[in-house]
Amino acid sequence: MSSISPFVAIRRDLHKIPELGFQEFKTQQYLLRYIHALPQERLEIQTWKTGIFVKVKGTAPRKMIGYRTDIDGLPIKEETGLPYSSEHEGNMHACGHDVHMSIALGLLTHFAEHPIQDDLLFIFQPAEEGPGGAKPMLESEIMKVWKPDMILALHIAPEYPVGTIATKEGLLFANTSELFIDLKGKGGHAAFPHLANDMVVAACSLVTQLQSIVARNVDPLDSAVITIGKISGGTVQNVIAEHARLEGTIRTLSVDSMKKVKERIEAMVSGIKMAYQCEAEIDYGSMYHQVYNDPELTTEFIQFAENYQGIRFIRCKEAMTGEDFGYMLAEIPGFMFWLGVDSPYGLHHAKLTPNEAAIDQGISFLISYITWKGNN
C-alpha cells in the first residue's frame, strides 16, 4: 500500500465526518486536537461557535494576513464508493471543504514552525453552505480585535487540472439569495374546483411568470438567474391543494440587478394573490454578497502565480457561484481563487472526487506566496 501525505490523510479523516452549518462539532474537535498538538509558542487560539480563530504571531509584524477556510458539509448522500466515504448518512463533503481544511492545516503547520515577519490569522469558518457563517464571524468581538489587513481564500475547481490556479480582478462570484414563496388558498374536492382556490395551479402560473424576469427585466449585458428547484403542494390526487411552496435561488452579477429581480418577484407574487384570491409570503432566506477581488492585491497574486514553477495560471470569467466569503472581502481587501482538482463530477455532486495531489501542491504554492507577501 502506497503511503500518503499527512494532509491527504487529514482530508480523508475529515471527509468521513461532514456536518451541516453550525453543527460542525466533531469537525471543530478534530481541528482543535490537531492545532493544539502544534508548537504553541506563537499561536493564540480562540473558538467562535463551531468555528476557530488561530493567530500566528510574526517575528516583526507590520500587518496581519488572513487566511479563511470553510468547514461545513452538505445534505447530500455520498455515492463515491470510496473507503473513506461519509460516516454521517445523508451528509457529504461535496463542495471540497475537506480539501480546503487540509490545506489550511498544512499552512498553519508550516507557519507555526517557520514564522514570517507579519502576523497571520487562520479562520476556520462554519456554515458557508448556509445559513452563512462569514458575516457573523466578521462581526464577532474576536475579529474586531484580530481584523486582518488583507485576506485570501481558495475554492476547489473540479473542471481545472491539478496544478491550475484561476482567478481575476474584480467580480469573481455572484450575489446570491435563497427564495421561498408560500401560497395559501382554499382546498376542496377535485370535483368542485369552482368552490376552491387551487394553489398548485397558482404555483405553476407563478413559476412560468418568474422566467420572464431575467428575459425582460435584466440588462442583457448583465447576468441573472432565477431557478426554482423545488415545488411542493397538495396531499392526495383528488383534493385541491390549499397550500403550495416554491423553493429556489436568485443569482446576479450586480447588486442593482438583485434589487430589480426581487422587486419584480414581489410584483408578480402580488399579482398571483389578486388573480387567485390567495395569501402569499416571500422569504429570501440566506443572502450572500458578491465576491469582489481587490484589483491591486489580485494583480500582484496573479503575477506571482504566473511566475511560479509548476503552476498554470488561467484568468477566468466571473461565475454565478455563491460564496459568503464575499462579506469578508467587502470589509477587508483580498481575493479568492480557484484551485484545480480535476474531478469528472462537479461541485455539490454525490460523486465528487477531487484529485488529492492538489492538496500538497496547494500547500506548497501558498506557503511560498504567503511567505513572500508576509516578508515584503
Swiss-Prot record:
One of its GO terms (biological process) is lysine biosynthetic process via diaminopimelate. Its EC number is 3.5.1.47. It catalyses: N-acetyl-(2S,6S)-2,6-diaminopimelate + H2O = (2S,6S)-2,6-diaminopimelate + acetate. Keywords: Amino-acid biosynthesis, Diaminopimelate biosynthesis, Hydrolase, Lysine biosynthesis. It comes from the Bacteria. The keyword Membrane does not apply. One of its GO terms (molecular function) is N-acetyldiaminopimelate deacetylase activity. Pathway: Amino-acid biosynthesis; L-lysine biosynthesis via DAP pathway; LL-2,6-diaminopimelate from (S)-tetrahydrodipicolinate (acetylase route): step 3/3. CDD domains: M20_Acy1_YkuR-like. The active site is at residues 70, 129. NCBIfam families: amidohydrolases. Catalyzes the conversion of N-acetyl-diaminopimelate to diaminopimelate and acetate. Belongs to the peptidase M20A family. N-acetyldiaminopimelate deacetylase subfamily. This is N-acetyldiaminopimelate deacetylase.
